[in-house]
Amino acid sequence: MAKVLVLYYSTYGHLETMANAVAEGARAAGATVDVKRVPETAPDEVAKAAHFKLDQAAPVATIADLEHYDAIIVGAPTRFGRIASQMAAFLDQAGGLWFRGALNGKVGAAFTSTATQHGGQETTLFSIITNLLHFGMVIVGLPYSHQGQMSMSEIVGGAPYGATTLAAGDGSRQPSEIDLAGARHQGELVAKTAAKLFG
């Protein structure tokens, strides 16, 4: 049975919701799944003034956690077309794991959220995936077997590189059922891939 970590950072709760959907998909494929978040690095007064969602149920991950999983699915929102600094700061601490090759051959995947349709979803996914490739991980995206990402009847997230959602500039849009279905599908694919590689 594959052991999967869904590792995320969420400012306003959109990625927390997506992370839980990713985990549902991985569990449905038979994996053992943990959902953990990275530490908030913004000062408390800044986070509170900006109404960050600070009461998230997931425990905070440590770098030492990462090597104990067969697959790691990383989610972070965009910041100007790239990975949010909180996740970047966390992954930047993984040099020791990289040096030892501790993540080589493990399965990796990415998911994200942006405020708008053209707010950097794919570039943010690539910035996450770049880290995972440097760690030596095998990448699983979100193929068009998730047909919801091809919808033209409504605004939807999703890309071949990973599950996505849109939050709107004021955070008012929550992940749609199509967005969540994409997240579940990606979680399922990661779990199935890890099971093939690790049993």
Swiss-Prot record:
Residues reported to bind substrate: W98
Cofactor(s) of this protein: FMN
Keyword Ribonucleoprotein: no
EC number: 1.6.5.2
Catalytic activity: a quinone + NADH + H(+) = a quinol + NAD(+); a quinone + NADPH + H(+) = a quinol + NADP(+)
InterPro entries in UniProt: Flavodoxin/NO_synth, Flavoprotein-like_sf, Flavoprotein_WrbA-like, FMN_Rdtase-like_dom, NQO
GO molecular function terms listed in the Swiss-Prot or TrEMBL record: flavin adenine dinucleotide binding; FMN binding; NAD binding; NADH:ubiquinone reductase (non-electrogenic) activity; NADP binding; NADPH dehydrogenase (quinone) activity
HAMAP family found in the cross-reference section: NQOR
Protein name: NAD(P)H dehydrogenase (quinone)
Protein species of origin: Azorhizobium caulinodans (strain ATCC 43989 / DSM 5975 / JCM 20966 / LMG 6465 / NBRC 14845 / NCIMB 13405 / ORS 571)
Lineage of the species this protein comes from: Bacteria, Pseudomonadati, Pseudomonadota, Alphaproteobacteria, Hyphomicrobiales
